Amino acid sequence: MFRGIYETTIDAKGRTSLPARFRDVLVESFGDERFFVTNSVPVDLGGGVYSSGLLIFPYQEWFIFEESFLNGKGLTSAQRNSIMRTIVAPAVECSADKLGRVLVPPHLRKNAVLEREILFVGAMKKVEIWSQSEWDKVRAHDMKAFPSDSEAVAELGL
């Protein structure tokens, strides 16, 4: 599982380094160094403002998601189209080079507003990528919502 938050940078050409621990997890837990990068589900910050990062899916986990999406019962046509345009269509297969460097394509960098300072955030079977500025907004939103989530957290044993 992916855990932890790692701060790093991305250059103007979209090159960044996938944390070594996450590269190890890809191979040790998921059996493949390849992965897919795509847009994350936008976070509603209220007042018509949304924030978005990116998601890294381990290679096989992406195909599990695709199968689930294709067989998804209960999705309306509008929901299916929105998911297709937002998450499925922009997905790109990637792998890190021997030094751990990854190239994030321009269309994904633009959507996630990736600037110089970025974060890789472990999210169990996925990894989130956020610009520092967008992460700060989402975390502030999460902290406001957290008290109302305390019952759900307690049910998880925390």
UniProtKB/Swiss-Prot annotation:
GO terms for cellular component: cytoplasm; nucleoid. The keyword Cytoplasm applies. One of its GO terms (biological process) is negative regulation of DNA-templated transcription initiation. CDD domains: MraZ_C, MraZ_N. It is found in: Cytoplasm, Nucleoid. One of its GO terms (molecular function) is DNA-binding transcription factor activity. Keywords: Cytoplasm, DNA-binding, Repeat, Transcription, Transcription regulation. It comes from the Bacteria. Residues 5-50, 91-134 form the SpoVT-AbrB domain. Belongs to the MraZ family. Forms oligomers. This is Transcriptional regulator MraZ. The gene is mraZ.
